[in-house]
Amino acid sequence: VKETIYSVMFDRIEAGTYLVAAAVTEGNLKIKNIIPKIIQTEINTLKKIGAKIKATKDEVHIIGNKKIKNMNIKTAPYPGFPTDLQAQMMVLLCKANKQSIIKEDIFENRFMHVAELNRMGAKISTNGNKAKVSGNIRFEAAELMATDLRASVSLILAALTTKGKSVINRIYHLDRGY
């Protein structure tokens, strides 16, 4: 056995979540030590929605835009749009100029976050594997219940955009992935 050095690659869902967080809060964020081509689908999606993104060999810089464009998204295996980023993107699409549709083609029952987002003022309806996301939403602070990892992070992202205090119960789900 010989000594070796190995570096673990970044988590593309975490990176995508941070990019969505910057977009939804109209923030300015630079992520270093990343390989942008691994998350090219996520970068392209955020650009189409209106975020300003510059990628170099090992970093991504995003500036969120107040004006978010609507978009229809379909989850798919890599390199398609990741199912594990669908809830976060739904929060961003609530701020879009028009209705968007998210089609979940990977797993069943992946809209657990919708009821709590609607309690915050979102207007999202689901039918099977499709969610219709109304745009021009301003989230309101609320006491909420996280049901899983994706719901946890989506509620945090929505709460970041509110005035007032939101309380997210059962946030321990977040520990599984972030």
Give the positions of each predicted feature.
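Short, structured segments at the rim of ligand-binding sites
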Residues: 1-178
